[in-house]
């Protein structure tokens, strides 16, 4: 009978994976076991720390529901979400860069006509957003589905409010024949990611703040083009260099320009990458 110890256990576990039928699953699981065991050996993980880690992951799962995804939030603050985006979504020069998806997108956002008020009662300073969707060749992309969502002036997304029965600060539009779209909303503000759960505990334990710089989320889809998931960040925000989820890219920083009537205006164009 084979006995296992700290010197031969990793090899034995990997050997058990030898008959995994899917090659990619085999590759991922083999690497995961190897790195996980190496991590435990490197830090000399104690049994109490192992139990604490199990409890932490359990609590993270218990925090998830149809309105909040604590595991995505955990992935975000560990930089894993952004690393995955950066590795898998390299774009040709000139294309709008992607960034993290975030935990507060929901299906079924209302559809709006150009110029409509997407804020729909959300608290904040009024703002107009003007955009254009093109391909890398500069040609307009007509009929692109442009979905946007954002937090309000208090740093909350609509889904974080108990009992709120209408969508606020989120909506879907379609670009016109010239690729253009515009809508009313509120000025983006910096806000803290939810820190009342396990992710917040981790941030406090490591001396990190929970703040994200002000931004608007966009997801843009069009036939013949790769789906773009990105943000537009507000220039001058003090958290641009310390985003809690590592999502800022210089090319995604935009200008919210104050108008003579006291409202604001953001102009930002999006360039999609064609599918092969």
From Swiss-Prot:
Phenotype upon gene inactivation: Disruption mutant is unable to grow on 2,4,6-TCP, but it can still transform this compound to 6-CHQ. Mutant accumulates an oxidized product of 6-CHQ.
A single MF term (Gene Ontology): ferric iron binding
Keywords, alphabetical: Aromatic hydrocarbons catabolism, Dioxygenase, Iron, Metal-binding, Oxidoreductase
CDD domains: 1_2-HQD
Cofactor note: Binds 1 Fe(3+) ion per subunit.
SUPFAM superfamilies in alphabetical order: Aromatic compound dioxygenase (SSF49482)
Pfam hit, one: Dioxygenase_C
Pathway linked to the protein: Aromatic compound metabolism; Xenobiotic degradation
Binding-site positions, Fe cation: 157, 191, 215, 217
Regulation: induction: Induced by 2,4,6-TCP and subject to catabolic repression by glutamate.
E.C. code: 1.13.11.-
UniProt cofactor(s): Fe(3+)
Disulfide bond entries: none
GO biological process annotation, one example: catechol-containing compound metabolic process
Biological role: Involved in the degradation of 2,4,6-trichlorophenol (2,4,6-TCP). May catalyze the oxidation of 6-chlorohydroxyquinol (6-CHQ) to 2-chloromaleylacetate (2-CMA).
PANTHER family according to UniProt: DIOXYGENASE, PUTATIVE (AFU_ORTHOLOGUE AFUA_2G02910)-RELATED, INTRADIOL RING-CLEAVAGE DIOXYGENASES DOMAIN-CONTAINING PROTEIN-RELATED
Family indicated by similarity: Belongs to the intradiol ring-cleavage dioxygenase family.
Record's protein name: 6-chlorohydroxyquinol 1,2-dioxygenase
Organism for this UniProt entry: Cupriavidus pinatubonensis (strain JMP 134 / LMG 1197)
Gene that specifies this protein: tcpC
């Amino acid at each position: 009978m084979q006995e296992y110890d700290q010197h031969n256990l990793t090899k034995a576990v990997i050997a058990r994976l030898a008959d995994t039928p899917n090659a990619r699953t085999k590759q991922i699981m083999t690497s995961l076991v190897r790195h996980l065991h190496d991590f435990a050996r490197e830090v000399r993980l104690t049994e109490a720390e192992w139990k604490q880690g199990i409890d932490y992951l359990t609590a993270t799962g218990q925090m998830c529901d149809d309105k909040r995804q604590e595991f995505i939030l955990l992935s975000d603050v560990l930089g894993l979400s952004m690393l995955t985006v950066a590795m898998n979504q390299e774009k040709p020069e000139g294309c709008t860069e992607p960034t993290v998806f975030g935990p507060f997108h929901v299906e079924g956002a209302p559809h709006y006509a150009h110029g409509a008020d997407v804020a729909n009662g959300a608290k904040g300073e009024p703002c107009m957003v003007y955009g254009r969707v093109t391909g890398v060749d500069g040609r307009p992309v007509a009929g692109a589905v442009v979905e946007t969502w954002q937090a309000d002036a208090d740093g909350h997304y609509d889904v974080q409010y108990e009992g709120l029965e209408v969508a606020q600060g989120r909506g879907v539009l379609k670009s016109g024949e010239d690729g253009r779209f515009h809508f009313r909303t509120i000025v983006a503000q910096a806000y803290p990611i939810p820190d009342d759960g396990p992710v917040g505990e981790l941030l406090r334990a490591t001396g990190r703040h929970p703040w994200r710089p002000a931004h608007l989320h966009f997801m843009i889809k069009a036939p013949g083009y790769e789906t773009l998931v990105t943000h537009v960040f507000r220039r001058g925000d003090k958290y641009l260099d310390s985003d809690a989820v590592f999502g800022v890219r210089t090319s995604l920083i935009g200008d919210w320009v104050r108008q003579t009537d006291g409202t604001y205006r953001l102009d930002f164009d999006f360039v999609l990458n064609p599918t092969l």
